[in-house]
Amino acid sequence: MTDKSKEGGSGKLLYCSFCGKSQHEVRKLIAGPSVYICDECVDLCNDIIREEIKDVLPKKESESLPTPREIREHLDDYVIGQEYAKKVLAVAVYNHYKRLRNGDTTAEGVELGKSNILLIGPTGSGKTLLAETLARFLDVPFTMADATTLTEAGYVGEDVENIIQKLLQKCDYDVAKAERGIVYIDEIDKISRKAENPSITRDVSGEGVQQALLKLVEGTVASVPPQGGRKHPQQEFLQVDTSKILFICGGAFAGLDKVIEQRVETGSGIGFGAEVRSKDETKTIGELFTQVEPEDLVKYGLIPEFIGRLPVTTTLTELDEEALIQILCEPKNALTKQYAALFELEDTELEFREDALRAIAKKAMNRKTGARGLRSILEGVLLETMYELPSSTDVSKVVIDESVINGESEPLLIYSNSDNQAAVAE
């Protein structure tokens, strides 16, 4: 290896055999049999190899693309119920990545469009969990955005381009990886137009955000500041093609059921011509959501252009008591399994009796928070036990029954030493 300050043994100046720079113009000059290469050319070669590897990696990933059935079976391991939504998502995601693998155009010249997804369902029904589980299974970058924090460019709040920057951060600013990612935009119903008719006043957090999202969701080349953008303003912006990114939008759409019901009722006549229904025949919110049409979403406040960018629409039903009990026990990362693992770290067994699980489910149903409320109920029930357990000795088992959930008694503590066996409170 030759330093730039030194000359060859013969006293003559040495030059890089590739770029022609002299040893004084570069930091290092590496000698080989009758040839030399400088450090700049070595860096350039490394960059070329890295780019080639990036081009090959997506092809390798796509070769093992799981089928819709395999995707749905994986979702079954983590998400209880919502069978129709899982099937729709599995097909949409499979078609999206199949399109990326084969390019936007088929051999016959048919252009394949992008199918972004809209999830409509009550809070705690599994919208976010479905999107997260999909991204984890497919091993692609995933980011979440809250639509309520977004505003038009130039106003206080998050710019829509920030969504792409978050996605880049998830994959260490690897543009090729980011372009195969999934973006989940939550609370999309909260950016609905404030009035049904377009207003002359500026709606920067409602219709304005929908307009800003149009191009991003459909597919555009977004310019995103590089890592540490403000610290290094001289760096060029990264160009990210969003036409390859799958966008999943989700929202509870509170009140949409009334819009659908009004349309359905109008279709069946009004006044003396109206169809009379008994109380039992009244449809649930979940049943009404399955009848959603684009016109209902327009009336709700989404602009037609934005709805057109989300061609795959699926609805999630409200979780009933049995589904909540299943969620507590059956998934791979079920809450009861998580808390049992925490107690296991203290060498203590945690047991939930059947009546306790049912009581937890009933409590969550009353709170109308869906599966999201289950963890807060368990935290409240187990707080004192988790506080005292690390300081206690000989506790081998903790038993939770219905009376504990209802606040009528404390958890039963079973000690390894039978002389100490007792309940915390009778």
Swiss-Prot record:
Instruction: List cystine links.
Output: none
Alphabetized PANTHER family for the sequence: ATP-DEPENDENT CLP PROTEASE ATP-BINDING SUBUNIT CLPX-LIKE, MITOCHONDRIAL, ATP-DEPENDENT CLP PROTEASE ATP-BINDING SUBUNIT CLPX-LIKE, MITOCHONDRIAL-RELATED
What's the family?
Answer: Belongs to the ClpX chaperone family.
Cellular component per GO?
HslUV protease complex
Where along the chain is ATP bound?
122-129
Species assigned in the record: Vibrio atlanticus (strain LGP32)
Q: Does the keyword Membrane apply?
A: no
Q: What is this protein called?
A: ATP-dependent Clp protease ATP-binding subunit ClpX
Please describe the quaternary structure of this protein: Component of the ClpX-ClpP complex. Forms a hexameric ring that, in the presence of ATP, binds to fourteen ClpP subunits assembled into a disk-like structure with a central cavity, resembling the structure of eukaryotic proteasomes.
An example GO BP is:
cell division
User: Keywords of this protein's UniProt record, alphabetized?
Assistant: ATP-binding, Chaperone, Metal-binding, Nucleotide-binding, Zinc
Question: What Pfam families does this protein's entry cite?
Answer: AAA_2, ClpB_D2-small, zf-C4_ClpX
